[in-house]
Amino acid sequence: MPRLAAIVGGDGECEAVPILVRRIALALDPGLTLDIKPVLRVPESRLIKQGELERVVDLAARKTGGQGGILILLDCDDGCPAEDGPELLRRAISARRDLPISVVLAKREFEAWFLAAAESLRGRRGLADDLAAPPDPETVRGAKE
């Protein structure tokens, strides 16, 4: 059974990441079962400090027993995912070259992804049947409110 450890920056991601990863895995391979370890929540402001991301990546690797992958999912806020992502990935890989690691940075906020997917969520969990995405979901601040 494949193992995955996730590192996230916010409370919303702690709850959502295991569910989203399982749903994506199910869509790709209905027979796949993942062993998703408890999510590590570390604020982005701490993870950007030299040595902290590396420490948390090593902790995540130990949670997988050294056999699995690591997903790092963070809000990029006012940064640029295309610029910040490769540097964070480089640092993460330098901490644990023996495991596959992915860094995913949400432009502004992770929750904006749900705004972008509004049409696919219509009529679910009490959402309006005519729900529409805002013109530019990634510019919305406070998307979870």
Show which residues each predicted segment covers.
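C-terminal accessory helical subdomains adjacent to catalytic cores in phosphodiester-
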Residues: 1-4, 12-145
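Phosphate-binding/switch region of NTP-binding enzymes
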Residues: 9
